[in-house]
Regions:
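Mid/C-terminal beta-alpha module of Rossmann-like enzyme folds, strongest
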Residues: 185, 210-213, 217-259, 305-306
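A conserved pocket-lining segment of Rossmann-fold NAD(P)-dependent short-chain dehydrogenase/reductase
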Residues: 128-133, 160-166, 180-202
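Glycine/proline-rich active-site loop of Rossmann-fold NAD(P)-dependent oxidoreductases
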Residues: 143, 156, 168-179, 188, ...
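Amphipathic terminal alpha-helices
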Residues: 286-309
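Conserved Rossmann-fold NAD(P)-dependent oxidoreductase catalytic core, especially the SDR/UDP-sugar
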Residues: 92-137
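Conserved beta-loop-beta element that borders a ligand/cofactor-binding pocket
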Residues: 110, 146-171
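N-terminal Rossmann NAD(P)H-binding glycine-rich loop of SDR-like oxidoreductase domains
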Residues: 3-23
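NAD(P)H-binding glycine-rich loop region in Rossmannoid oxidoreductase-like domains
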Residues: 49-88
Length: 309
């Protein structure tokens, strides 16, 4: 299948491109990171340097494609950028898909668009409480892409769906909060986290499996939560301590007394029963295997933080 991956040079894109190409798909990558595109060059992969907000570039990228995996995002804190780059860019992508008779679009969504978790586990019927999201502008822009996809899915013969992600990881894992915990273990000898809070981590090969199941089943206008393993911040912090500084300790503060980032107190345990029921999705990893893989990703992050200290 001819597949376009937007944002293919990002944290998720590299692994997605690699696996799809190895499985025999013809992959085209659209990204503005010229150096990153060079690193992705391999048999079966075509690269195109450009921005999602450039309509002419998007039209060129979509030509002859049968499926699109949309990972591109500006991550700007400026609401105008989110509208002008991300929302408008997604509209360009949708319109180009219609014009080129694309069969599938899979949009990478985020738990942030759910706002604030009102229950546990969180399923796809959870309300989108944008005003209470940790990044309301980001959440709103992501929600707009979800809804645009639904509109186009029912107006045109394209299977457009959104995959909801809380925290994805592959051979590496990033994020300022994890880096902050590593730094605290190294410099303060302790990591302080809220008790009984955490989230559903998604291993990238499971994400790719979910994408492939969507391509096979062909639902339209749906949201799908995907997850590999749920971990509390206490568990993750202990994994960091074991690698960064075994003499450090983990301190769990009751949630009601927590004064740090609200991101850490929102408990994002994903209900993935919809994906299991409709797609036949299932994580390929046992809990022990998922934790071991995450430990490897954390090891790379620890090395990065140590080198910067």
């Amino acid at each position: 299948m001819n597949i376009l991956v937007t944002g293919g040079c990002g944290n998720m894109g590299g692994r997605v491109v690699e696996v799809l190409a190895k499985e025999g798909h013809k992959v085209r990558v659209l990204d503005k990171n010229e150096a990153g595109l060079k690193a992705l060059q391999q048999p079966g992969v075509e690269t195109l340097c450009g921005d999602i907000s450039d309509q002419a570039v998007v039209q060129k990228a979509v030509e002859d494609m049968k499926a699109i995996i949309h990972l591109a995002w500006s991550f700007s804190a400026d609401f105008s950028d989110l509208l002008d780059i991300d929302v408008k860019g997604y509209q360009y992508l949708l319109d180009a898909a219609v014009a080129n008779k694309v069969d599938h679009i899979i949009n990478a969504g985020t738990a942030v668009a759910y706002g604030k978790p009102q229950c546990s586990p969180v399923d796809e019927n959870h309300p989108h409480i944008i005003a209470q999201a940790r990044k309301p502008a980001y959440a709103l822009a992501k929600l707009v892409t979800e809804e645009m996809g639904k509109v186009y899915a029912w107006k045109y013969p394209i299977a457009i769906n959104t995959v909801m992600i809380w925290y994805a990881y592959g051979d590496e894992i990033g994020g300022k909060h994890i880096r902050g915990m590593i730094k605290d273990a190294l410099t303060k000898g302790e990591i302080v986290v809220p008790a009984s809070c955490g989230g559903s981590f998604l291993q990238l090969d499971d994400f790719i499996d979910g994408v492939q199941r969507i391509l096979e089943v062909k639902p339209r206008g749906e949201l799908f939560n995907l997850s590999t393993v749920y971990l509390t911040w206490e568990e993750l912090a202990q994994m960091i301590v074991d690698q960064a500084n075994p003499q450090a300790k983990v301190v769990a503060v009751p949630r009601e007394k927590w004064q740090g980032s609200s991101f850490l107190t929102d408990d994002w345990c994903f209900d993935i029963s919809k994906a299991e029921r409709i797609l036949g999705y299932k994580t390929r990893l046992s809990r022990e295997e998922a934790v071991k893989h995450l430990e490897g990703a954390l090891k790379a992050c620890v090395a990065e933080v140590k080198s910067a200290c």
